[in-house]
Regions:
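Alpha-helical scaffolding within the catalytic cores
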Residues: 30-31, 53-64, 157-167
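A general structural detector for well-ordered alpha-helical segments in enzyme core domains, enriched
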Residues: 29-33, 59, 63, 91, ...
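C-terminal domain-boundary segment and adjacent tail
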Residues: 36-44, 196-276
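Short glycine-enriched, charge-decorated loop/helix-capping segments at active-site entrances
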Residues: 20-24, 85-86, 234-241
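Active-site-adjacent pocket scaffolds in enzyme catalytic domains
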Residues: 105-214
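Metal-dependent polysaccharide deacetylase catalytic core of the NodB/CE4 family, i.e.
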Residues: 3-4, 16, 40-121, 130-131, ...
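N-terminal regions that are enriched for targeting/export leaders
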Residues: 1-35
Length: 276
């Protein structure tokens, strides 16, 4: 069965938690990414942090006109799963309203900052009418302040699934979890552009074959699209190695991947999951 690759972009500030207010990736990298996607005819889903939406209306308009998918990436990049339910719900509501005011379509996809979701988060999303969550990264866990558990996705299912008990809901009103794909070259990390920049596109194409699941969510961050060393030399080398202002390797990956998989979007995956 042919594998499906969903290119998924977290539109956020540069190196959250390490750099304060960096926007180089959004301002320089995302426009280049849009040109590349148009050139190779690959669709993508863009998950927006609220501050980016309000600060860059021209970019918002360009992505909307290109008819890429639009998702919510939260108010900021603080962990959501460590907050009380009432706070989680209010933050999701506020970020939803910001996207509703900026885009012609209502946002129905969500990705928590830093993959920080739990069952409470997922229940809130379902209650608020979200159709898709793509926050869970199987194989990953995180601690707050290196001590307090924030989330643990190590045993999470790797294929699309309903994460919240059904109750009396019909399938078409339930939240579908479409997990981010774990990178077989670096367990616990996401498969995405950072891996191409760090290991080369050929190794990432090989990694696609190593992944057992049929649906792959391929993650892109804005700061991976720029020469981050020139702007943020104090960022750890492991993160800088995942960045490049030359999208040539990404272009070659997209071409090579098309020979072994098809490109899709998260809404299309949901439609297929529901039998539509």
């Amino acid at each position: 069965m042919t594998k499906r690759i969903c290119v998924s972009v977290d539109v956020e500030e540069d190196f959250p938690g390490l750099v304060k207010g960096g926007r180089r990736g959004v301002e320089e990298g995302i426009p280049e990414l849009l040109r590349l996607l148009e050139d190779v005819h690959v669709p993508a889903d863009f998950f927006f942090q609220s501050s980016i939406v309000t600060e860059h209306p021209d970019l918002v308009s360009r992505i909307a006109k290109a008819k890429h998918g639009i998702g919510n990436h939260g108010l900021n990049h603080a962990f959501l799963s460590t907050k009380p339910p009432a706070v989680q719900k209010e933050e999701i509501r506020r970020s939803t309203r910001i996207l509703e005011n900026a885009f012609p379509q209502e946002p129905r996809m969500f990705r928590a900052a830093g993959f920080s979701t739990n069952l409470v988060t997922l229940e809130i999303l379902q209650d608020l009418g979200y159709a898709i969550d793509s926050s869970i990264l199987p194989g990953r866990r995180a601690k707050r302040f290196r001590v307090l558990p924030a989330y643990d996705h190590r045993a999470a299912p790797r294929d699309p699934h309903f994460p919240v008990p059904s109750g009396d809901r019909s399938a078409d009103t339930r939240l579908l979890e479409i997990p981010v794909t774990e990178n077989p070259l670096r367990r616990g990390g996401p498969l995405g552009l950072g891996a191409i920049n760090a290991y080369g596109f050929d190794k990432v194409v090989t990694a696609i074959h190593a992944v057992e699941e049929r649906t792959l969510v391929f993650l892109v961050h804005p700061w991976e699209l720029i020469d981050a060393r020139a702007y943020y030399p104090k960022v750890p080398e492991g993160l800088l190695a995942a960045c490049s202002g030359d999208l040539g390797a990404f272009r070659e990956f997209l071409k090579a991947a098309r020979a072994v998989a098809e490109f899709s979007t998260l809404p299309n995956v949901r439609r297929g999951f529901l039998g539509g």
